């Protein structure tokens, strides 16, 4: 199949006069001949493509001629192409920028762009400077700029290091201003023990202050170097004594912390078991109400049936079995699902002080046995009464 023919004679005849009438508008004459001679010899072959486009006979010829023209244009990369595509001057660039500033679309696209404060991107030397840096260096510079900017915005300033005296003063203020809620709940005897412990703490703080003063006065290498042997020995004894005192205090505080944690666990377990027993007692009460209601309905229906039926014999096997079953229910409970020890009442005597950890442990064991309906409930309850309520 032959390629379609192209008839361009009439169109180019119409274009020639328009190009001749307005010679100043040279870019509008796309297919006209070049009005001036090309200076570059490598582009001299383009002069042969002046009016030959009119003699094209098919699309294939048009494509081939276009390929040849491209090859001629891109043969020499160093050739000057200002005659073919003139570069815009500075005035035209400024006019385009002014028109872009009035465009709403351009403003919407460029509002989120924040240039770097340390670099002016309009500087022509900035491209050469950035070209010599690698991507990692550029990335590091950007991170440094971002960190500096965030620090300046947030106003973060490094606090100066505190001396030992300042730290001790802050600790004293914290201990004086922060009341301990546990000490308020303790009895008078424990308060006396707390006063003695606070006095011991104040003594330790005084020793720390005296020790730090000696350290601050003689901490430098030169100060220690000029001290005599007896002074160094005395200072060493002070340091070792302070270390022993602080170690003992640390051990006591850690032991106290362990005791408080254990007491907290015992209280939590007691509260948990108590809530579980109360929930089970509530379920059992609801179940008993339901059974009583069903029993009342069954008795009412049985009375109606007995009125319609003949009276049974006085001493029958059915009557004897019913009597035995009712006696067993009254002795051991109505059914095997009833909890025998769930509703056990635990005697408790309210005192001025809260129950101790040992008392809470005994109560927790009793409640756990009640929840499981264990046979150990009477034994545990007896031990609790003898040891807590009526100690010998």
UniProtKB/Swiss-Prot annotation:
Subcellular location per the Swiss-Prot or TrEMBL entry: Cytoplasm, Cytoskeleton, Microtubule organizing center, Centrosome; Cell membrane
Keyword Heme among UniProt keywords: no
Tissue expression per record: Mainly expressed in brain.
Record-listed Phosphoserine modification sites: 58, 298, 316
PTM comment: Phosphorylated by protein kinase C zeta; which enhances interaction with UBE4B and polyubiquitination. Polyubiquitinated in a UBE4B-dependent manner; which does not lead to proteasomal degradation and may be important for neurogenic activity. Polyubiquitin linkage seems to be mainly through Lys-26.
Any single GO BP term: cellular response to growth factor stimulus
Record GO terms (molecular function): gamma-tubulin binding; protein kinase C binding
InterPro entries tied to this protein: FEZ
Residue ranges of coiled coil: 230-298
Source organism superkingdom: Eukaryota
Region (Disordered) location: 1-37, 175-198
Keywords assigned: Cell membrane, Coiled coil, Cytoplasm, Cytoskeleton, Disulfide bond, Membrane, Microtubule, Phosphoprotein, Transport, Ubl conjugation
Oligomer and partners: Homodimer; disulfide-linked. May form heterodimers with FEZ2. Interacts with the NH2-terminal variable region (V1) of PKC zeta and weakly with that of PKC epsilon. Interacts with UBE4B. Interacts with SAP30L. Interacts with SCOC and ULK1; SCOC interferes with ULK1-binding to FEZ1. Directly interacts with SCOC and UVRAG. Stabilizes the interaction between SCOC and UVRAG during amino acid starvation.
Family (UniProt): Belongs to the zygin family.
Function (record text): May be involved in axonal outgrowth as component of the network of molecules that regulate cellular morphology and axon guidance machinery. Able to restore partial locomotion and axonal fasciculation to C.elegans unc-76 mutants in germline transformation experiments. May participate in the transport of mitochondria and other cargos along microtubules.
Name of the featured protein: Fasciculation and elongation protein zeta-1
Species this protein is from: Homo sapiens (Human)
Gene name linked to the record: FEZ1
């Amino acid at each position: 199949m032959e390629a379609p023919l192209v008839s361009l004679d009439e169109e180019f005849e119409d274009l020639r006069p328009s190009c001749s009438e307005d010679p100043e508008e040279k870019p509008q004459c796309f297919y006209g001949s070049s009005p001036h001679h090309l200076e570059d010899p490598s582009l001299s072959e383009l002069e042969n493509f002046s009016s030959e486009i009119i003699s094209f006979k098919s699309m294939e010829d048009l494509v081939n001629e276009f390929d040849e023209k491209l090859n001629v244009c891109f043969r020499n990369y160093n050739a000057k192409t200002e005659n073919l595509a003139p570069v815009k001057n500075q005035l035209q660039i400024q006019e385009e920028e002014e028109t872009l500033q009035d465009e709403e679309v351009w403003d919407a696209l460029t509002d989120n762009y924040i240039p770097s404060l340390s670099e002016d991107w309009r500087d022509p030397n900035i491209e050469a400077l950035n070209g010599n840096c690698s991507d990692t260096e550029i990335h590091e510079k950007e991170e440094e700029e971002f960190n500096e900017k965030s620090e300046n915005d947030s106003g973060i300033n490094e606090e100066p290091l505190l001396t030992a005296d300042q730290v001790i003063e802050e600790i004293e203020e914290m201990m004086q201003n922060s009341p301990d809620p546990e000490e308020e709940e303790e009895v008078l005897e424990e308060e006396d023990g707390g006063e003695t412990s606070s006095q011991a703490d104040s003594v330790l703080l005084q020793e720390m202050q005296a020790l730090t003063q000696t350290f601050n006065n003689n901490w430098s290498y030169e100060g220690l170097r000029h001290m005599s042997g007896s002074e160094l020995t005395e200072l060493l004894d002070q340091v070792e004594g302070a270390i022993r005192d602080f170690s003992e205090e640390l051990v006591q505080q850690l032991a106290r912390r362990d005791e408080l944690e254990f007491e907290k666990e015992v209280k939590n377990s007691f509260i948990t078991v108590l809530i579980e027993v109360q929930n089970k007692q509530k379920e059992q009460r609801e179940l008993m109400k339901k059974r009583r209601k069903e029993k009342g309905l069954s008795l009412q229906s049985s009375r109606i049936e007995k009125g319609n039926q003949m009276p049974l014999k006085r001493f029958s096997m059915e009557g004897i079995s019913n009597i035995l079953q009712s006696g067993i229910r009254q002795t051991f409970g109505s059914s095997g699902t009833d909890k025998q020890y769930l509703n056990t009442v635990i005697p408790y005597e309210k005192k001025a002080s809260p129950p101790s950890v040992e008392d809470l442990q005994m109560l927790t064991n009793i409640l756990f046995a009640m929840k499981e309906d264990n046979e150990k409930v009477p034994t545990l309850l007896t031990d609790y009464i003898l040891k807590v309520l009526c100690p010998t």
